[in-house]
Amino acid sequence: MQQQTINIRAAKKSDAVIIARAVAMAIGDENALKNYCGENYITLLKQIAESEKSQYSYLNALIAETNNTPIGAAIGYDGAKLHELRATTYSIIYDTLGRTPSIPDETEGGEFYIDSIAVLPEYRGMGIGKQLITAIRDKALSDGHARVGLIVDFDNPRAEQLYTSLGFTRVGTRTFFGHKMWHMQYII
């Protein structure tokens, strides 16, 4: 594939589909999404991304694009706002499915949390994920956050190595969707 120019920008409402795809890829378990949300889980995640007050809102996202085509996204927010953002997210899920999931808190106050990051498969291995992480981390720091956190599966040492190369360090563990995760932070 020819070297392409990558642009990182703030998301727009019209980016809801790539945000939905990024969230689904970050969750990583398509079967669980289908079992819980049905075949149209991307449509539900898109609706959540279009909301201004949800966890996965376009207002909380940065987009990687090439030739004006979105190819990846990073979603992050102030951990202190998790319950407020999750309430909107759960409301949309309930309105669609008649039930809400039970998800443990993966962040807390005092931390800007990188919730989801993903790049379309055909664009992986080109440093785009690294650009997205750096951009959302730097945005959080410029917005006044002293800590930027994320979680990474114990079974994903490549991702952990990437985060470590960007200055993130292990600060604890979390269990999320039955998976053991490292809680990592970048601290000023």
Task: Kindly give the residue locations of the regions a language model identified.
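C-terminal "cap" of GNAT-fold acetyltransferases
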Residues: 146-160, 165-167, 173-188
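Conserved GNAT acetyl-CoA-binding A-motif
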Residues: 110-112, 124, 140-151
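A short beta-loop-alpha structural element at the N-terminal edge
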Residues: 7-21, 32-33
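Conserved acyl-donor/pantetheine-binding loop and adjacent beta-alpha core of acyl/acetyltransferases
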Residues: 80-112, 116
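Active-site rim helix/loop that mediates acceptor-substrate recognition in acyltransferases
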Residues: 39-61, 66-67
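Conserved acetyl-CoA-binding loop-helix of GNAT-fold acetyltransferases
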Residues: 125-142, 161-165
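Conserved beta-strand in the GNAT
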Residues: 63, 69-78, 113, 118
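Conserved GNAT-fold acetyl-CoA-binding loop/helix
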Residues: 27-49, 86, 94-96
